[in-house]
Amino acid sequence: LDFVDKIIGISSDVEFEHFDPGKLVPTLEALDAVSSGSVDAAYATSGYWQGKINSASLFAAVPFGPEAGEFMGWILYDDGAALWQEMYDTNGYNVVATPCGVIAPETSGWFKNEINGVEDLEGLNMRFFGLGAKVMEKVGVSTSLLSAGDIFPALERGAIDATEFSMPKIDARLGFHKIAKFNYFPGWHQPSTLFELLINKDVYEELTDVAKKQIEVACLANITTNLAEGEATNYAAMVDNVENNGVTLKQWSPEMLALFEEKWNEVAAELADGDPFFQKVWADMQEYRAGYKVWSNNIYLPRN
């Protein structure tokens, strides 16, 4: 884990030991384990807690939401980080959350068959993450959240028909291309994905101020290198998939993207209506994004 290397390199007051996902506790139980003190800390993405906290994925990945630069602006220079911690506090979790990573957009999914319209999605079983899963359910897909090591076996035995997980470089390590030959873009469900360092609050409060600052600095460095690596290395995996693995790269049609966005707006409205804290975070993010457009619409060259 890059963060552990960074903190070891600069720290005089705190030490981390890295264990692979699932080694100490199951991935999806990491939040509870840190909160209870079973483990001191976990590096994760808050979207894994979507089943526990409706607003969790707003601090991980938002369908049709902010890309990395815009997202980090909200987190580090607006209200995002404070709301992130407030989410855990109000839900009774004994943790301190530090923003600690961000990755480039993900692929939209790996499918065994070409998807020509919404009718081809209906009835599929698919591994899907976070808020995007609720969108897929609205178009007829049955979704489940599987940790990384469980996805390929599920694809192989037919328990799921399709999956999304991460960027092409990371997906390549998991071997999805061996079974699902149609890789769809863009990753509307995760235009960027944030990661967090969770530390048990009692453990954190025992740290020196120097140690807390070293953790913060290591996480900021991790954010920078995460993003740069994602931008620099994914095209090679895409080329390799096409040239050597028989993968077809597909783009969702404008009609399909419009459908996904329509369903996302329905999901967001439903969650906001039923959860005051989701509404609070969602409104804050939307206010920030409206202001951000004054900058982004004027300063950046057209993308297409």
Model regions and ranges:
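N-terminal secretory/targeting leader peptides
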Residues: L1-F71, E86-N304
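Divalent-metal coordination cores built from histidine and acidic residues
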Residues: L83
